Amino acid sequence: MSAPCHCKHVDDSSSNDKLSALSPELQQEFKDPNHPANLICELCRLFYDNNWVTGTGGGISIRDVDGTNPNLVYIAPSGVQKERIQPWEMFLVELPDEKILRTPNDIPKELTKSYKYKPSACTPLFISCYTLRDAGACIHTHSQHAVMVTLFFENEKEFAISHIEQIKALPKLKYNDETGKIEKIGSMEYYDKLVIPIIENTPHEEDLTDSLQEAIKNYPGASAVLVRRHGIYVWGETVWKAKVYNEAIDYLLELAVKMKLAGIPLVKQE
């Protein structure tokens, strides 16, 4: 059960009134507060307040792992103000063929104001996390802490930090030779070293896909990929796990910036 959202960007009663313009099927679908589309709205407002998805940047995608069809993926559209996003504005994609089942352009014009919605440029990167890691959700933010870390380590291909309590919030992952999948075998320990790959930014988001896929394959223990001078992609087995991982990693990135400025090594020598 999700925690209630206390954000004040959108009037919930107004949102409920607008549902009446939708088909009866969609009205029923979006009444569930735990529906992936509603959770994306909730998290977008939270992330906006954290300064992670400002200026229409960033994005969130959720795979309906708890629904009747876990191949259904809900993706926030491109170029919209994340703190004002509504559940009917999501793109609905079905894996593995990546078939678009529904777009916000199908919604009554009185709700969309005839705005022409575009799929998120992050879509191929989100799909990569689902296909390569069997993720339940993927989060992309433009966190300043993520950007700063990639600038501090301008010539490095990875970020590493150890002996910080918050590391324990992240999963310990291992490749299973029998299943051919990356599986969670527990949680990281205080003394473990967290390593996150860094890939180079590109002029267009979708052009990051090959580099992201390569990083995911080369770093089986990672739950995130940093994009230099851009932000970060974080995924998890469920939307709430992805949220926890994203928050924990951002905490560690912020701490790393402060440690670097203070001349404190990020990886403690034994």
From Swiss-Prot:
Reactions it catalyzes: 5-(methylsulfanyl)-D-ribulose 1-phosphate = 5-methylsulfanyl-2,3-dioxopentyl phosphate + H2O
First-listed, main subcellular location of the protein, grouped into a coarse class: cytoplasm
Binding site for Zn(2+): H140, H142, H230
CC cofactor: Zn(2+)
Residues noted as binding substrate in the record, renumbered to the chain: C122
GO cellular component: cytoplasm
E.C. numbers: 4.2.1.109
Active site, per annotation: E165
Cofactor details (free text): Binds 1 zinc ion per subunit.
Domain of life: Eukaryota
Pathway: Amino-acid biosynthesis; L-methionine biosynthesis via salvage pathway; L-methionine from S-methyl-5-thio-alpha-D-ribose 1-phosphate: step 2/6
Pfam families in alphabetical order: Aldolase_II
Enzyme class: lyase
GO biological process: L-methionine salvage from methylthioadenosine
Leader peptide range in chain numbering: none
HAMAP family attached to this UniProt entry: Salvage_MtnB_euk
Family the UniProt entry places it in: Belongs to the aldolase class II family. MtnB subfamily.
Protein name as annotated: Methylthioribulose-1-phosphate dehydratase
Species this protein is from: Candida albicans (strain WO-1)
Biological classification of the source: Eukaryota, Fungi, Dikarya, Ascomycota, Saccharomycotina
Gene that this polypeptide is encoded by: MDE1
